[in-house]
Amino acid sequence: MALPVYSLKSHIPITTIASAKMNYTPNKGMITANGRSRRIRLSPNKIVACAGEADRTFPSQSLEKTALFPDQFSEKNGTPSNFTPPNREFPPSFWNNDIINSITASHKVQTGDRKRIQTLISEIKNVFNSMGDGETSPSAYDTAWVARIPAVDGSEQPQFPQTLEWILQNQLKDGSWGEEFYFLAYDRLLATLACIITLTIWRTGNVQLHKGIEFFRKQVVRMDDEADNHRPSGFEIVFPAMLNEAKSLGLDLPYELPFIEQMVKKREAKLKMITTNVLYTIQTTLLYSLEGLHEIVDFDKIIKLQSKDGSFLGSPASTAAVFMQTGNTKCLEFLEFVLRKFRNHVPSDYPLDLFERLWVVDTVERLGIDRHFKKEIKDALDYVYSCWDERGIGWAKDSPIADIDDTAMGLRILRLHGYNVSPDVLKTFKDENGEFFCFMGQTQRGVTDMLNVYRCSQVAFPGETIMEEAKLCTERYLRNALENADAFDKWAIKKNIRGEVEYALKYPWHRSMPRLEVRSYIGNYGPNDVWLGKSLYMMPYISNEKYLELAKLDFNSVQSLHQEEIRELVRWCKSSGFTELKFTRDRVVETYFAVASSMFEPEFSTCRAVYTKISVLLVILDDLYDGYGSPDEIKLFSEAVKRWDLSLLEQMPDHMKICFLGLYNTVNEVAEEGRKTQGHDVLGYIRNLWEIQLAAFTREAEWSQGKYVPSFDEYIENAQVSIGVATILLITILFTEEDDILSHIDYGSKFLRLASLTARLANDIKTYQEERAHGEVVSAIQCYMKDRPEITEEEALKYVYGRMVNDLAELNSEYLKSNEMPQNCKRLVFDTARVAQLFTMEGDGLTYSDTMEIKEHIKKCLFEPAT
């Protein structure tokens, strides 16, 4: 049959293959005319001739009236008279054109924003590059203790007069001393008491002294109403001891108040727990508060527990107290070292090098700006890893005491970045009752340290029971904290720690997509958060307005690009005729979110487009094969795909023509892009993937039509293909900016199999009951029950869930272990498995996205700017 070719100008048939020496090659989508080739795309209402780089489109008259398959769009459908498609309607897409256009008109990224982004990146790189032993704010409390030290030359002057001058110059307007930008009564009371004692000792600053006493007298009577949630570390030890000292100095302060009596009782109870054996042989947190233990401590014995740097747990106050009792030169050298750094004051804790580096890395990662600082992050983590200890780490490289907060943060981040670290380090912080605490042998724990252990526990590998124990313990603790309205922290005062805990519990790692976490943390991050030792302190390299500003600008810039891509994909879907199909789900935006929530960077634009198009086609063909198409139609469609033959279109009903042309055109276009990217032809490779996919769909259709329930193993073998994850990924990886990618992953890859299997099991767990109501008899749960007729449905469900959890742990191991698979490919595979967990969190989130929380996630990630 002669094929007419349409003139690009007149739209009139100008020749035929016979008269123009033209050849049409169906499997390549090419027309060759007089020796020149053009690729064509066919769709229900147009032919697009591709010449050179640009597509040139010319409308045809209705194709059923032409000689190009003259009956291809006729009303005949060839459906067997005894086949009736199921009467199942899917919800329409929430994301229609009006909604998309109205939302995406909300903001545009300006040129000034892009310049500001570059400026902020440069400034934050400077933060990384200037990290030393830790940037932290002044501690009036510790500075007052250092200012007490008399000159070592015997003169009646302070050894560090600049610290005394700092106290005189830094009294706050209300007469107190302490953290200026955050009022915490405990902090102000303790710092003020320390300062007025120091001024009394040196008989100076009468004005400041009287103002300080006045503040103290007014504030201490209000302390009965203060909650214990943010009482500074060691307050009950040092505060009563300092009151005794103030009394001996003749300071006119109230000493008989209920609050003071309560603190005295707490101190006595704590001192009773201290044994001589522990005090002088084991480094514990008591070393942090030695200034409050002078009446019971033999300071000559305590010296042997001194840290390498000469301090006692990095506390200037504790170290100053020991020096005044012993004259130890290493104590003095430490204080001189700190003052060389800070000049006229000292911080609450120093150094804080490990703490600062880990929290800065965690901050930029959670805010989604880490891609701008890859080298800086590696340098910071190399430093931390060089200090890693199998017993755990503390806040500084030479800290003699490990804490679970820094250890858990370090374990999680180092493992995620490929460092070899063992979770056995957590055993240090587990007591005989199976509970986890911040310090070995202590009973203290707070929300942030338990939250960090919980986050850490989720990067577990198979067989790591300590991680499972940590997860159960911390999850229980955090849920109780929320239920009891006790989501306050012992170690930090954060903008929205409750929000952080709620997010972590609702969206654990395998369900939390990167952009979803970023959007949440932008709202929870506090650029003015403060930490709590013996006094409040700020860490400007951790809590910083610049991080938040960059996070918002960067998020909105990327989001603007994503919106442009969505509009293009919606147009593609419409021009392909897919919106006219009534039997399937229109889920362009949802499938785009599935990839953009992970591979969000501008350089992965083609990757996102391909992922979305393949996903849309999978949804359509899944619905076609899953009951709407008759057995003969399915067989015909599969044969057309196998032969890649457009001539079979004339035997198809209209809806199948749309499906086949959409698949045909998209695969050819993707293959051409893949050839450019990979440097070799990939059309055969992509077609083969689709043949495998449709074979799996066909097998499921045969099971459904025959009411056949396979064995569990037989089901799993097919189901991990039919879920479509492998088809999506094995095509999309061609566009992850990696060379020779196909040498690293294929259908036999364990990593890919686990991603497919966990996605399938998650889907079955949440949808099998609804599918059964629609006549489906095959799911992992039903197949497992067939193999074991004696078990209940609940037991089968429990088994399938346990299998999925174990496979997720295996997936962790495959993702994080060191091998030759490129990181971008790993990330795409792993996050596709994660997004499957997210979509099935409440049920079938793809089908019913308009009524589930997934809709809100899409809004926040793709349409609502961060403000």
From Swiss-Prot:
Entry GO CC: chloroplast
Residue numbers binding Mg(2+) 2: 622, 626
Binding site for Mg(2+) 1: 622, 626
Residue window of motif DXDD motif: 403-406
Residue numbers binding substrate: 270, 490
UniProtKB keywords: Chloroplast, Lyase, Magnesium, Metal-binding, Multifunctional enzyme, Plastid, Transit peptide
InterPro entries on file: Isoprenoid_synthase_dom_sf, Terpene_cyclase-like_1_C, Terpene_cyclase_plant_C1, Terpene_synth_N, Terpene_synth_N_sf, Terpene_synthase-like, Terpene_synthase_metal-bd, Terpenoid_cyclase/PrenylTrfase
Biological process, per Gene Ontology: diterpenoid biosynthetic process
One of the Pfam families matching this protein, by short name: Terpene_synth_C
The organelle targeting sequence, given as a residue range: 1-49
Molecular function (Gene Ontology), one example: copal-8-ol diphosphate synthase activity
Superkingdom classification of source: Eukaryota
Family: Belongs to the terpene synthase family. Tpsd subfamily.
PANTHER family for the chain: (E,E)-GERANYLLINALOOL SYNTHASE, ENT-COPALYL DIPHOSPHATE SYNTHASE, CHLOROPLASTIC
Protein name: Bifunctional cis-abienol synthase, chloroplastic
Organism: Abies balsamea
Source species taxonomy: Eukaryota, Viridiplantae, Streptophyta, Embryophyta, Tracheophyta
Gene that this sequence comes from: CAS
